[in-house]
Amino acid sequence: MNEVAANFSAHPVLEGDISTGRLERVLRSGRFAVTAELNPPDSADPEDTFRQALVLSQVCDAINATDASGANCHMSSMGICALLTRAGYSPVLQISCRDRNRIAIQGDVLGAAAMGVHNILCLTGDGVETGDQPGAKPVFDLDSTTLLSAIRGMRDDARFLSGRRISTPPDVFLGAAANPFAPPYDWRPLRLAKKIEAGAQFIQTQYCYDIEMLRRYMGVVRDLGLDEKCFILVGVGPLASAKAARWIRANVPGVHIPDAVIERLAGARDQKHEGKQICIDLIEEIREIKGVSGVHVMAYRQEHLVTEIIQKSGILKNRIINAETARSARRTEEATAVS
């Protein structure tokens, strides 16, 4: 463990701003950050995206545009980011290695940066067999770690993987996913260390429903000094019922839901309300854990619940976040830069 920690002294990834994006500014200021997932529509109507984004923007520092999560096809992450940047929102482009090779991915990074996307989350991606088109041909030319390294090289060295020069490199804030709640547990902090070494500057975790397990994980993360090398946002989300929780635990890989949580739901008169309250309670405990920099809220097809959960948790106390505030701040920054 000490040897791993020592290797990070040469990688001060948190020194100095990388992008001009809101998420990085909030994290570097020491404020507790909030991100959330926009579940992409099965539609070509931009209003379907804008309606969801408007709800999330009231409480979020950045909005994740998922990239065919679960290997199911929806509007692309790139398309959603194009819409969100045009409307003045701060998106997180998710890139899954499942569907595109290194040539396409590097081109997407440049295109996204040119549109004003400042945040990229690098993912290996779910296997095609988990989705509704299992006959699709998987690519996996890169994985999440090699993708992080590739984009970092584009940004910091202004070069493609081929070695060819990039005239204007992308100024992107790099993120990755982590799952503290799946075995082998001892290996999870070491996996995080490898992603940070590859270039990850922020981390969004899988759903957390077990605070004690998170505390143990963060204890090792702090011992390794990894919390000083990246910003960790812990995944949370409401459970609709005890039945839904049992189904998720049995069918969604990597999601750990303790018996005590399911029993609490099962014993509630209004299980949906209790699921929201459990999420709020978890956020209140998560914010007290040293080394945690924020939360990442995932509420599938329930964006309206995100605002209620975040507001009731109190983590945005004394902070005002909405679309108009973000646009005003952006106009002020642009005017300052010009002057």
Question: What does each of the following model-derived ranges do?
Answer:
Residues 45-47, 71-83, 101-107, 127-147, ...:
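Active-site-adjacent beta->alpha loops and helix N-cap segments on the catalytic face
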Residues 17-23, 47-55, 71-89:
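Glycine-rich, positively charged N-terminal anion/phosphate-binding segment
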Residues 33-48, 69, 91-103, 172-187, ...:
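Active-site mouth loops of central-metabolism enzymes
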Residues 37, 63, 112, 195, ...:
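Conserved, mostly hydrophobic/aromatic
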Residues 12-13, 138-167, 177-182, 224-282, ...:
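Active-site pocket-lining/capping segments in soluble small-molecule metabolic enzymes
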Residues 324-334:
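Short, low-complexity, charge-dense intrinsically disordered segments
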Residues 97-115:
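Glycine-rich anion/phosphate-binding loops
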Residues 2-39, 43, 51, 159-171, ...:
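N-terminal amphipathic alpha-helix/helix-capping segment at the start of soluble metabolic enzymes
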